[in-house]
Amino acid sequence: MTNIRKSHPLIKIINHSFIDLPTPSNISAWWNFGSLLGVCLALQIITGLFLAMHYTADTTTAFSSVTHICRDVNYGWLIRYAHANGASMFFIFLYFHIGRGIYYGSYNFMETWNIGVILLFLVMATAFMGYVLPWGQMSFWGATVITNLLSAIPYIGPMLVEWIWGGFSVDKATLTRFFAFHFILPFIITAMVMIHLLFLHETGSNNPSGLNSDSDKIPFHPYYTIKDILGVLLMLLTLLSLILFSPDLLGDPDNYSPANPLNTPPHIKPEWYFLFAYAILRSIPNKLGGVLALAFSILILMLFPALHMSKQRSMLFRPVSQCLLWILVANLIILTWIGGQPVEYPFITIGQMASISYFCIILILMPTTSFMENKLLKW
């Protein structure tokens, strides 16, 4: 009799995706982040569902309903902080996952890569709308500032902003629709993840050497399932430490004050994982220019396959390119720091320099370096 996992129509798909999947034998811990992101997504959907059972999407009761979750619901504080800090873990892993893709040239799987960039946009939209829901000061003003950016679009901008708001300012209608979108988007993300995996399994995984690994593959289970479980345990250890010891470390104290349209906080800033893009937005004095730079700072990821000039796929044997990538990482850390600082000298200048160098490294220096490395190797 044929094994059920190889014959059953549904189990067969799972078998080909997670059990008998031929996987390169040399993939490192950098390949763990895909599964970690999957676990994060599941965790966010589960905790989010339990939060939605007690949350009310109304301007008069939203803030107090979150307080009620933390104080009166059994383990409500745990669910709330697991959801908030789970989002931070999600973005840490996302950035590692993208960084791995750039370092090892995984962006040459173009369909997988482009679906991944769309996924990044969807996750960013979901996180932004989720940040608005507790209806604290930073929720309200963050929503006002970020949605207002659309008014920079010529001709239709102001009309578009009022359409998103559902009125003449961020109010009850805005909160209700943001809750609806925040609830539905994770399921759309899950569907996109399946497409992401479908495209990945068409080509098979990349590996650190960047070479074809068809001659040396091993089954995903048990070798990589056990490796992924180790990653998940380390993630849960980190996440639980964060939740139980310093749950508000990555949050903003302003969000513990209820939203007040008459009182603007001294520094309006998004969550830490958006600060690099926020710094790029602020570093351009023109509103439309800033919005375009903000969009392009993420969209630039789609250009990586076109900017790949090297004859080698991976950066493993390209020390100069490696050096440039780590400079880019340092640059992004500087941008993240600047995004959280007030708009004054010297932060404005540092932000502008970091923004220019961000685009220069990706668009000019990395392709030029790859070209030079080819010449040095007489390729």
UniProtKB/Swiss-Prot annotation:
Localization of this protein: Mitochondrion inner membrane
Membrane-spanning parts: 33-53, 77-98, 113-133, 178-198, 226-246, 288-308, 320-340, 347-367
Keywords for the protein's UniProt record, in alphabetical order: Electron transport, Heme, Iron, Membrane, Metal-binding, Mitochondrion, Mitochondrion inner membrane, Respiratory chain, Transmembrane, Transmembrane helix, Transport, Ubiquinone
GO terms for cellular component: mitochondrial inner membrane; respiratory chain complex III
GO molecular function: metal ion binding; ubiquinol-cytochrome-c reductase activity
Needed cofactors: heme b
Family matches, as PROSITE patterns: CYTB_CTER (PS51003), CYTB_NTER (PS51002)
Membrane topology, as annotated: Multi-pass membrane protein
PANTHER family xref list: CYTOCHROME B
Family of the protein in this entry: Belongs to the cytochrome b family.
Function: Component of the ubiquinol-cytochrome c reductase complex (complex III or cytochrome b-c1 complex) that is part of the mitochondrial respiratory chain. The b-c1 complex mediates electron transfer from ubiquinol to cytochrome c. Contributes to the generation of a proton gradient across the mitochondrial membrane that is then used for ATP synthesis.
Other information: Heme 1 (or BL or b562) is low-potential and absorbs at about 562 nm, and heme 2 (or BH or b566) is high-potential and absorbs at about 566 nm.
Protein's recorded name: Cytochrome b
Species the sequence originates in: Trinomys paratus
Gene symbol of the encoding locus: MT-CYB
